[in-house]
A protein has these predicted regions:
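Class I S-adenosyl-L-methionine
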Residues: 53, 78-81, 85-92, 197, ...
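S-adenosyl-L-methionine
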Residues: 84-120
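Glycine-rich helix-loop-beta junction characteristic of Rossmann-like nucleotide cofactor-binding loops
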Residues: 27-33
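Conserved S-adenosyl-L-methionine
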Residues: 55-66
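N-terminal, positively charged/glycine-rich alpha-helical extensions of SAM-dependent methyltransferases
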Residues: 1-7
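Conserved beta-strand elements of the Class I
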Residues: 37-39
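Signature of N6-adenine DNA methyltransferases within the class I
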Residues: 10-24, 42-50, 64, 70, ...
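Secondary-structure boundary motif
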Residues: 31, 58, 86-93, 175, ...
Length: 261
């Protein structure tokens, strides 16, 4: 996105996903369903959701796809719309029914009730998803931010917004639904993420983690030196005694196709 400066991206915690990473993430997901629902919160130009849908269509006989994306950056929305118009035309030519919604509202403020354990407040099944794929924004939120106030059950200290995206997404999965995120590694340790970890690991069984050995390569175009990981998991509906997590690693994105386990 040459129209957005690196300074503006950093201020918004906005780092656009390289195509190589989008394809790698989409390759970790699969389904046998004919009717699929996908959520891409913080979608940017829809690189992730487009890569995922392309992958799913190649894998199986898909009859219909429902896609919901969230993006609040008015400078990006035009590109988001262009990408989805092109995707819709491509799927139409393949005989696939495709419905999509672009939400310009704040993802957290619109969906924080998904964190609730009260059945009366939980999202309807129709509002849940088979797949959630995301490269959310990364930045710390002040304690008086409205998004912090509505997510107090997973906040301890000053949270990073990406953890709120992950937690809320966990509550928006269908039964047997899967999510995959590329996020900083910071959630894995430290007091500030304690309540988030308790909630997220209680709701999601992590099945795959990809580690990058270098900080420089992942979002090189945005001049980012952030330690990031790719995390995949599925909704936990019952206790599984024999849980196995596949861990792979690469130096960066140039050797993703040769990622080692």
């Amino acid at each position: 996105m040459s129209t957005t400066s690196n300074e503006a991206k950093k201020e918004k915690g906005q780092f656009f996903t390289p195509v190589e990473i989008a394809r790698f993430m989409s390759e970790q997901l699969s389904t046998e369903k004919e009717d699929i629902s996908v959520l891409d919160p913080g979608c940017g130009t829809c690189v992730l959701s487009c890569a995922l849908i392309e992958r799913l269509v190649q894998l199986c006989t898909v009859r219909s796809i429902r896609l919901v994306v969230y993006e609040t950056d008015s400078g990006v929305i035009a590109y988001t719309k262009q990408a989805l118009i092109y995707l819709a035309e491509t799927l139409k030519n393949q005989g696939i029914n495709f419905d999509y919604v672009i939400c310009e509202d704040d993802f957290i403020l619109q969906n924080y009730q998904a964190l609730s354990s009260s059945p009366s407040l939980l999202q309807k099944d129709a509002d849940k998803f088979d797949f959630i794929i995301s490269n959310p924004p990364y930045f710390k939120l002040p304690k008086d931010d409205s998004r912090v106030k509505v997510t107090q059950q997973i906040v301890d200290g000053q949270p990073n917004i990406y953890s709120l995206f992950m937690a809320i997404s966990a509550g928006l999965l269908n039964k047997s639904g899967e999510l995959i995120f590329i996020v900083p590694r910071s959630f894995a340790s430290g007091r500030y993420f304690r309540l988030f970890r308790e909630y997220f690991l209680g709701a999601i069984d992590i099945s795959f983690i990809h580690l990058f050995n270098t900080r420089k390569d992942t979002f090189a175009k945005d001049d980012v030196l952030q330690e990031t990981v790719i995390v995949k998991g599925f909704r936990r509906d019952e206790m599984i005694n024999d849980r196995r997590i596949c861990i792979s690693y690469s130096e960066g994105i140039t050797d993703l196709n040769a990622a080692r386990q």
